[in-house]
Amino acid sequence: MNRALVLLLYVCTVSCLASSKVILMRNNITLSFDDIEANFAPSVKGTGEIGVVYVAEPLDACQNLMNKPEQSSNETSPFVLIVRGGCSFEEKVRKAQRAGFKAAIIYDNEDRGTLIAMAGNSGGIRIHAVFVTKETGEVLKEYAGFPDTKVWLIPSFENSAWSIMAVSFISLLAMSAVLATCFFVRRHRIRRRTSRSSRVREFHGMSRRLVKAMPSLIFSSFHEDNTTAFTCAICLEDYTVGDKLRLLPCCHKFHAACVDSWLTSWRTFCPVCKRDARTSTGEPPASESTPLLSSAASSFTSSSLHSSVRSSALLIGPSLGSLPTSISFSPAYASSSYIRQSFQSSSNRRSPPISVSRSSVDLRQQAASPSPSPSQRSYISHMASPQSLGYPTISPFNTRYMSPYRPSPSNASPAMAGSSNYPLNPLRYSESAGTFSPYASANSLPDC
């Protein structure tokens, strides 16, 4: 599109400079018409020629002209208006020159709308000759013969050095303007694109509203913990009493001014552990080194196991009275931290039922209560364990610490159960029923 514009401007400039003009001037009327000079006649020089136009007689000027130009007092030259046809252009011009006219204006006899260059022998031709259209000839014919009507023949610059320089200069100026416009438009687009991408690339921080929402504290003393408790990792200055510290979700502390500038202007993670400060969860984000089971999942599994053990202990407690096992409890052994295991031997005869002691009654009452206290739950879990109820366990761990003495129904007496001649290896229990398990921890082993 730019090249087409330059070419059009060039053509218009050349056409304007190459074509000569015929200017009609009368009082307040000024009309301009295009013409083209004859090849065999002298060209118009300088600023042009001014004269008065007359109509030729005969109009085609193929014969000697009957009318003669009138001598004017002012410096105007007589011009003759001739129609095309009947004879050659050269003959018409020679007849006009012989009659005393200074220029011959020949117009077309048909309305073709185009100008043609007249050709002929230039020998002996001393006057100017131009060709105009039929429309221009009709207008000039109306104003012919009036002394106050002037016709100005403007020369053509087609063959002059000035025309070549002017065309070259205007063409160069137009091309330079187009190239400069394209250059500045392209540069402006590149600057806009670069500034937009740089603004997006430079913004890495958080909003001040999110940073101010993080907890802050006033430093009072040094603490031994997992945080940066002595020196700010950003400015490398020691904390002093009264400094305002900002606490990130990863529990690292920094000067409030330092970490606020870091989070809002540079990055959104902790300068120490690289954890994203926009996350408020207690667990760090998952990575390749993250364990399969987190601490939250393990604590949930442990609490579920403790709850199941506690519920099974409460269910066993109320059914103590219906057990056919012979169990004897004494107040001394109820308050002791050791429980002796007794197993009933397999026999066909059933031992007579015995009365349940005070400890068993208390156990049933506490188990039947709707919401036992933590101390009661611990006591119930301890007294209602499978070992204290007489149920044998087949675990290899329990058989290792099982008493070698197996009482039979005939020798199951309180005296024998309370005797110290048969040492037992009881399990040590903890304060809560939820941790009573041989696989819970190493602390459950005896004398560890």
Curated annotation (Swiss-Prot):
Keywords: Disulfide bond, Glycoprotein, Golgi apparatus, Membrane, Metal-binding, Protein transport, Signal, Transmembrane, Transmembrane helix, Transport, Vacuole, Zinc, Zinc-finger
Annotated compartments: Protein storage vacuole membrane; Golgi apparatus membrane
Signal peptide: 1-20
Glycosylation site residues: 28, 74
CDD domains per UniProt: PA_C_RZF_like
Transmembrane segment boundaries: 164-184
Pfam families, per the entry: PA, zf-RING_2
Entries under InterPro entries matching the protein: E3_ligase_sorting_rcpt, PA_dom_sf, PA_domain, Znf_RING, Znf_RING/FYVE/PHD, ZNRF4/RNF13/RNF167_PA
Region ranges (Disordered): 344-380, 402-424
Stretches assigned to the Cytoplasmic side: 185-448
Polar residues bias locations: 408-423
Disulfide pairings: 62-87
Domain PA: from-to ranges: 60-144
Any Gene Ontology biological process: protein transport
A cellular component annotation (GO) from this entry: Golgi membrane
Functional summary from the UniProt entry: Involved in the trafficking of vacuolar proteins. May function as a sorting receptor for protein trafficking to the protein storage vacuole (PSV).
Name of this chain's protein: Receptor homology region, transmembrane domain- and RING domain-containing protein 2
